[in-house]
Amino acid sequence: MKWLSGLSWLAMGLAMAVIPVRADSQPDRPDDIVLVSEQWNGYTEADGTGLGWDLMRELFEPAGVQVQARVEPYTRAVGLVQRGEADAWVGAYKNEVEGTLYPQWHYDVDEIYALSLASEPTPTLHTLGSYRLAWVRGYEFEHYLPDIVHFNEVARREPILNMLDHSRADLYIDAKPEISFILQQTKEPERFRTTYLAAIPLYLSFANTARGRSLRILFDRRMAQLVRSGKLRPIFARWKQPYPFDLIDIPVKTGMRQ
């Protein structure tokens, strides 16, 4: 009967009205995110362990987005995101490349160090222009550190100590964990010196796709919630790393990597 049918629709409407809806739910948001990263020791390991992967899971999975972690060389990781074959790459600097999207929030900082022979003068941030520098291909520190003049990009970290020993470079530039790993490969670490240079904020860089745009909105919302609540602090503590949001982390130089 018509009046009974109307009551049925009314009952259905009332039932739907009381179904709880997550505050951060979006009907068109993906239920997974494909994240790609270079393999960094203790940060983004190939087996899915590390500080970086733990941060990503805490950011996305409580919001219903499953993290799919993938490890690739850095330049390939960037290319996958630029082509929309992955949703974001881990460890980007602000405005690093064109054609991808950057959130408002950073999630960590890169503590950048110089590795040199201990017998050589100690470098400073403002004397880098007088040294021959080396770093991993694709990192492009010339856009984020001041007064860079002479530099060479290397494909692998393994020959770095040999390059310094044979004066093929004066300084090797990298993040602190990677330099620590390099020094573990020598029986004479006292022959080398590490010098702090700068702290550069780290971002996810998202694909310029509908998925990427939706996931970027979620990332910024979740970062605001987690920093305010302090829920990221125990993750940094578990990996014995400083909590980046206690500091004022401003890159020495910003701008588009070319």
Residue spans for each PLM region:
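Bacterial N-terminal signal peptides
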Residues: 7-17
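Periplasmic-binding protein-like
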Residues: 37-38, 109-112, 184-220, 243-257
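Short beta-strand-to-loop elements that line the ligand-binding cleft
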Residues: 66-73, 149-156, 160-163, 194
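A ligand-binding cleft/hinge motif common to bilobed small-molecule-binding domains
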Residues: 79-83, 92-100, 170-198
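Ligand-binding clefts/hinges and TM-proximal coupling segments of bilobed small-molecule sensing domains
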Residues: 140-156, 223-258
